[in-house]
Amino acid sequence: MNIEATLKNYDLSKLNVVTIASHSSLQILRGAKRHGLGTVAVAKPGSGWFYRRFNFIDNVIEIDLGSMEQLAGDLVKNNAILIPHGSYVEYVGWRRALSMPIPTFGNRYIIEWEADQRKKMRLLEYAGIPIPRSFNDPTQVDRPVIVKLSGAKGGRGYFIAKDAGELAGKLSSINTDDYIIQEYVIGVPAYYHYFDSKVYDRVELFGMDLRYESNVDGRLFNLAEPTFVVTGNIPLVLRESLLPTVQKYGEDFSRAVAELVPPGMIGPYSLESIIKDDLSIVVFEFSGRIVAGTNVYMGVGSPYSVLYFNEPMDMGERIAHEIVNAVKRGKLINVLT
């Protein structure tokens, strides 16, 4: 869409932040309201009642999320800025996200890369970030591996195999070839939250978390195969000596996206990693938008946010801060696609 032409008809004093009512929407909309922006939640039929309980949400619209384009005209008339997150990627789909006729905060084109596991790894490799070994031929597997399906499904459908024989048996039971086989790296998981600011021209390391996954983090007692469906998140603070490496990876990723997926990273994104016992960091995934792990800091702010703003701020507030200050500096077009 022609963002510049659309913004000419916007009343920039009456912007409305719009997002799908799921994932990190409460954090996003609360942050928008705190910064004086209007707020709209687009909910699946039957789920809007929950979001109507919160007075920081001005309007809750229930609609089949696959038909969200039907709302675009009215939303644009009301100066809408769409904030994508994982549920938007999953339920609306990356193809619709690319063509959605609503100005979108962030780089909407990275969503296509995020939806494809092979393109994901290619982008990380291009950035020069250490990644796990991948196997194109299942018969060549010589170590424990994890099989990952494409799409933002919160880890649903992923599984582990200890060797090539076990892998062959498990692959025969799935009905898709849209997956990658990746070395299962042993270590501590850590998920890093970044914000690429066009207002301040910097990449901010804004926080980090651990995922709590069912049932690999539950009580298996050898009664079930481990699965990786995300059920929640846990705050994390890293030892300070690791922070320069994490910052460098975030900046390297931002540079790679600028080269391969113009106009580059805008706003929140995440690198997902394993920290090995030698303290080396291997990155196995990225998310090109806000991640649900940022919810652990909602209302209290990440401890790292004070390093930039001298006050705690959560990612929802950070997004709103960027929008408001982009308007003040005449840079709103620089944070939208």
Swiss-Prot record:
<keyword id="KW-0464">Manganese</keyword>
<comment type="function">
    <text>Catalyzes the ATP- and formate-dependent formylation of 5-aminoimidazole-4-carboxamide-1-beta-d-ribofuranosyl 5'-monophosphate (AICAR) to 5-formaminoimidazole-4-carboxamide-1-beta-d-ribofuranosyl 5'-monophosphate (FAICAR) in the absence of folates.</text>
</comment>
<keyword id="KW-0067">ATP-binding</keyword>
<dbReference type="InterPro" id="IPR023656">
    <property type="entry name" value="IMP_biosynth_PurP"/>
</dbReference>
<dbReference type="GO" id="GO:0016879">
    <property type="term" value="F:ligase activity, forming carbon-nitrogen bonds"/>
</dbReference>
<feature type="binding site">
    <location>
        <position position="272"/>
    </location>
    <ligand>
        <name>Mg(2+)</name>
    </ligand>
</feature>
<dbReference type="InterPro" id="IPR010672">
    <property type="entry name" value="IMP_biosynth_PurP_N"/>
</dbReference>
<dbReference type="GO" id="GO:0006189">
    <property type="term" value="P:'de novo' IMP biosynthetic process"/>
</dbReference>
<dbReference type="Pfam" id="PF06849">
    <property type="entry name" value="DUF1246"/>
</dbReference>
<dbReference type="GO" id="GO:0005524">
    <property type="term" value="F:ATP binding"/>
</dbReference>
<feature type="binding site">
    <location>
        <begin position="144"/>
        <end position="191"/>
    </location>
    <ligand>
        <name>ATP</name>
    </ligand>
</feature>
<dbReference type="GO" id="GO:0000287">
    <property type="term" value="F:magnesium ion binding"/>
</dbReference>
<feature type="binding site">
    <location>
        <position position="23"/>
    </location>
    <ligand>
        <name>5-amino-1-(5-phospho-beta-D-ribosyl)imidazole-4-carboxamide</name>
    </ligand>
</feature>
<feature type="binding site">
    <location>
        <position position="87"/>
    </location>
    <ligand>
        <name>5-amino-1-(5-phospho-beta-D-ribosyl)imidazole-4-carboxamide</name>
    </ligand>
</feature>
<keyword id="KW-0658">Purine biosynthesis</keyword>
<feature type="domain" description="ATP-grasp">
    <location>
        <begin position="121"/>
        <end position="328"/>
    </location>
</feature>
<dbReference type="Pfam" id="PF06973">
    <property type="entry name" value="DUF1297"/>
</dbReference>
<keyword id="KW-0460">Magnesium</keyword>
<dbReference type="InterPro" id="IPR016185">
    <property type="entry name" value="PreATP-grasp_dom_sf"/>
</dbReference>
<comment type="pathway">
    <text>Purine metabolism; IMP biosynthesis via de novo pathway; 5-formamido-1-(5-phospho-D-ribosyl)imidazole-4-carboxamide from 5-amino-1-(5-phospho-D-ribosyl)imidazole-4-carboxamide (formate route): step 1/1.</text>
</comment>
<dbReference type="InterPro" id="IPR013815">
    <property type="entry name" value="ATP_grasp_subdomain_1"/>
</dbReference>
<keyword id="KW-0479">Metal-binding</keyword>
<comment type="similarity">
    <text>Belongs to the phosphohexose mutase family.</text>
</comment>
<feature type="binding site">
    <location>
        <position position="233"/>
    </location>
    <ligand>
        <name>5-amino-1-(5-phospho-beta-D-ribosyl)imidazole-4-carboxamide</name>
    </ligand>
</feature>
<feature type="binding site">
    <location>
        <position position="285"/>
    </location>
    <ligand>
        <name>Mg(2+)</name>
    </ligand>
</feature>
<dbReference type="InterPro" id="IPR009720">
    <property type="entry name" value="IMP_biosynth_PurP_C"/>
</dbReference>
<dbReference type="InterPro" id="IPR011761">
    <property type="entry name" value="ATP-grasp"/>
</dbReference>
<keyword id="KW-0547">Nucleotide-binding</keyword>
<keyword id="KW-0436">Ligase</keyword>
<feature type="binding site">
    <location>
        <position position="213"/>
    </location>
    <ligand>
        <name>ATP</name>
    </ligand>
</feature>
<protein>
    <recommendedName>
        <fullName>5-formaminoimidazole-4-carboxamide-1-(beta)-D-ribofuranosyl 5'-monophosphate synthetase</fullName>
        <ecNumber>6.3.4.23</ecNumber>
    </recommendedName>
</protein>
